[in-house]
C-alpha cells in the first residue's frame, strides 16, 4: 500500500508539473505576441505645460482704452478713450483706403484730360490766324463804308456818331497805304463835332476822366496758368502702440474730413455698445449682457488689419479734443 501510494503520489506531481509547463509556455508566447504588436502603438507624450490647450472658462477682460491719433499735413487730431470694440479701427482704416483710392482715380482722370488737351494744343492756332484775317478784312470794309457815306452827305454828324472815334482812327490808320490821310480826316471831323456839341450845350470846361495808374499792373488779371494740385502727404493712424501709414494721400474731395467723421462715428458706436453692456438688475440685465456679447463676437469676425510697429509716440498737439467738426482739423 505504501509503495502504491508513493507511486500514485509521484504520478500526481509529475502531471501537475507538465500542466504548469504548458501554461507557462502559453503565457510566454502570448507576452511575445503582445510585445510585437505593442511596437506599432502610439504612446502619448507628457505635456510640458499641462492645461495649456484647455480653453479657459473665465472671460477675457475688455481691452483698455487708448488714444487714437490721425496725423496729416503737419497737423494731428487726438481722440481720447477710444475703444476698439466693434471693429471701429478696422472700419476707420477701410474708410481711409477707400478715400485714397477715389482721389487717385480723380487725379488720373484729370491727367488724362490734360494729356488729350496737350495733343490738340497746336490745332486752334491755324483757325485763330484765319479768323483774325477775316475780322481785319471786315473792319476795313466797314471803315471805308462809314467814311464814304459821311463824305457824300453835306451835314456835320452829331457827336453820338463818333463816340468810338479813337478806335476808328486806329482802324483807318491800319487800313492801307492811304490810311493816314483818312485817319486825319476822321479826327478833324470828330473834333469839330465835339466842339459844336460843347458850344450848343454851353459847356466851356471839359471834365475829363483821369484813369488811376495801378500800383501792381496785372494784379486784377486772372492768371491763365492752372494752379498745381495740392502736394501729396502721408496719412498716419496710430492706435495701441501701432501705426498705419498711407503714402501719397491726396486731400482733394474732403477725404481727410470724411476720415475724421468716420473715426468720430466709430467712437460714438463704441460708447453706445459700452452703455448697452452695462450690468442691469434682474433677468433683463442678463439678457442684455448676452445680446451685447453676441454682437461683440460677431463684430470681431472682421479681417485683421496689417500694421507695423511705430516709433516712439509724439506729444499730442491738441490733447483731449475729440471734436469732429471741420474746423477742428483744418
UniProtKB/Swiss-Prot annotation:
InterPro entries: CCT_CS, TIFY/JAZ, Tify_dom. It comes from the Eukaryota. GO terms for biological process: regulation of defense response; regulation of jasmonic acid mediated signaling pathway; response to wounding. Residues 267-330 are annotated as: Disordered. Ubiquitinated. Targeted for degradation by the SCF(COI1) E3 ubiquitin ligase-proteasome pathway during jasmonate signaling. It is found in: Nucleus. GO terms for cellular component: nucleus. Residues 61-97, 228-264 form the Tify domain. Disulfide bonds: none annotated. A motif (Nuclear localization signal) lies at residues 126-133. A motif (Jas) lies at residues 124-142. Pfam families: Jas_motif (PF09425). Keywords: Jasmonic acid signaling pathway, Nucleus, Repeat, Transcription, Transcription regulation, Ubl conjugation. Repressor of jasmonate responses. Belongs to the TIFY/JAZ family. This is Protein TIFY 11f. It comes from Oryza sativa subsp. japonica. The lineage of its organism: Eukaryota, Viridiplantae, Streptophyta, Embryophyta, Tracheophyta. The gene is TIFY11F.
Amino acid at each position: 500500500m505504501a509503495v502504491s501510494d508513493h507511486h500514485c503520489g509521484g504520478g500526481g506531481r509529475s502531471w501537475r508539473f507538465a500542466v504548469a509547463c504548458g501554461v507557462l509556455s502559453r503565457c510566454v508566447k502570448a507576452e511575445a505576441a503582445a510585445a510585437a504588436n505593442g511596437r506599432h502603438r502610439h504612446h502619448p507624450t507628457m505635456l510640458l505645460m499641462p492645461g495649456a490647450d484647455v480653453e479657459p472658462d473665465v472671460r477675457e477682460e475688455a481691452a483698455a482704452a487708448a488714444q487714437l491719433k490721425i496725423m496729416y499735413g503737419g497737423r494731428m487730431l487726438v481722440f481720447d478713450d477710444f475703444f476698439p470694440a466693434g471693429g471701429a479701427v478696422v472700419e476707420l482704416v477701410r474708410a481711409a483706403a477707400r478715400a485714397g483710392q477715389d482721389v487717385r482715380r480723380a487725379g488720373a482722370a484729370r491727367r488724362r484730360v490734360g494729356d488729350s488737351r496737350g495733343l490738340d494744343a497746336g490745332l486752334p492756332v491755324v483757325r485763330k490766324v484765319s479768323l483774325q484775317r477775316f475780322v481785319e478784312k471786315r473792319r476795313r470794309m466797314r471803315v471805308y463804308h462809314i467814311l464814304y457815306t459821311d463824305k457824300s452827305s453835306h451835314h456835320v454828324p452829331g457827336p453820338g456818331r463818333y463816340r468810338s472815334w479813337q478806335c476808328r482812327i486806329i482802324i483807318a490808320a491800319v487800313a492801307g497805304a492811304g490810311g493816314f490821310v483818312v485817319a486825319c480826316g476822321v479826327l478833324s471831323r470828330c473834333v469839330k463835332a465835339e466842339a459844336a456839341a460843347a458850344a450848343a450845350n454851353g459847356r466851356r470846361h471839359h471834365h475829363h476822366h483821369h484813369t488811376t495808374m495801378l500800383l501792381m499792373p496785372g494784379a486784377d488779371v486772372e492768371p491763365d496758368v492752372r494752379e498745381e494740385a495740392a502736394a501729396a502727404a502721408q496719412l498716419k493712424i496710430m492706435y495701441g502702440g501701432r501705426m498705419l501709414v498711407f503714402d501719397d494721400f491726396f486731400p482733394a474731395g474732403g477725404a481727410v474730413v470724411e476720415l475724421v467723421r468716420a473715426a468720430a462715428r466709430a467712437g460714438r458706436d463704441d460708447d453706445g455698445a459700452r452703455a448697452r453692456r452695462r450690468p442691469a438688475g434682474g433677468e433683463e440685465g442678463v439678457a442684455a449682457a448676452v445680446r451685447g456679447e453676441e454682437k461683440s463676437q460677431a463684430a470681431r469676425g472682421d479681417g485683421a488689419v496689417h500694421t507695423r510697429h511705430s516709433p516712439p509716440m509724439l506729444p499730442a498737439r491738441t490733447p483731449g479734443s475729440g471734436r469732429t467738426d471741420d474746423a477742428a482739423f483744418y
